[in-house]
């Protein structure tokens, strides 16, 4: 194995349950995330990182790999998130499959679940590689503990294995609650103090992402008028029916299951209620600013039209922006994309530069003034029991970070 401690680190990290809690009012959202951040801080100190500190204000643990060159080069930040998605993360029991043949069905522990190339054709890309997968009862946590392990392995390499590898100052940060969309809300750009950064939070080999969705959330309250159904004619207003009518007024094909690429959507996350009152929760996504604003306006227009027809204000939307397409920031200086692309090409990795149908912590951090695109970390089928990662892809992620650092030495600050 190229980096001896990369896999052991990853296996250690994924066994810790750091599932974030969207219903929490604290930062981080769970005590487990606080404890894991402190554990990472101790590990960072053990590797030799300097100025390691935990920020109570946002749950991030930060450390520094000091420069070992006199060149005036740009300071690089590397970020990954410690939390995992909303799927069972208790008792993660990673399974290791060496020299996968690229075609066999992989049994997930003792469960009835399998990784079948017929269902997951991406498996065919991993012939001859070592895969880490789940036992079928939990997620794996490669999102984003692959990124955490890769950054820690990079730090170990620079500080202990090959301390003569020339580099400028590198700052490392691990934070909470990315999966519930609030992890970067309180990120401290001034404390991190770098010229540019990358989140190591992408998927398969070669992913390089700087264009995200712009995102908003919408909560629609429906006020009905409930009377006995036997005498309801011309009197009852069923709030649940209002919710159905509202949803049906949205474009039928603008849904996640019917869109791809640069196409945006409305996604109904939750609908509950009674004839008296109901509540629908949506997310709104689009890459283009104009279309994003049009989607938000449409949700208000539908409510206004329904209220006019009802003669009463019974449909009440509240729409709040969540994050914006970070391409608006990064396209002002594409050098950090160019250097990452060049690093991959130097390593015979084909860069995959496509819009993210989602967001990253970098979306918010970029709008705070720190351009932060996203690099691959290796995970596939993330957020569930079918998640897996290739050890060789994780190694190439470390290689890519090292090559970015090497190329950065050639760019004067």
Curated annotation (Swiss-Prot):
InterPro entries: ArgE/DapE_CS, Bact_exopeptidase_dim_dom, Peptidase_M20, Peptidase_M20_dimer, Peptidase_M20B. It comes from the Bacteria. Its EC number is 3.4.11.4. Zn(2+) 1 binds at residues 81, 143, 201. Its main location: cytoplasm. CDD domains: M20_peptT. It catalyses: Release of the N-terminal residue from a tripeptide. Its cofactor is Zn(2+). PROSITE patterns: ARGE_DAPE_CPG2_1 (PS00758), ARGE_DAPE_CPG2_2 (PS00759). Binds 2 Zn(2+) ions per subunit. Keywords: Aminopeptidase, Cytoplasm, Hydrolase, Metal-binding, Metalloprotease, Protease, Zinc. The active site is at 83, 178 (proton acceptor). One of its GO terms (molecular function) is metallopeptidase activity. Belongs to the peptidase M20B family. NCBIfam families: peptidase-T, PRK05469.1, PRK13381.1. This is Peptidase T. It comes from Lactococcus lactis subsp. cremoris (Streptococcus cremoris).
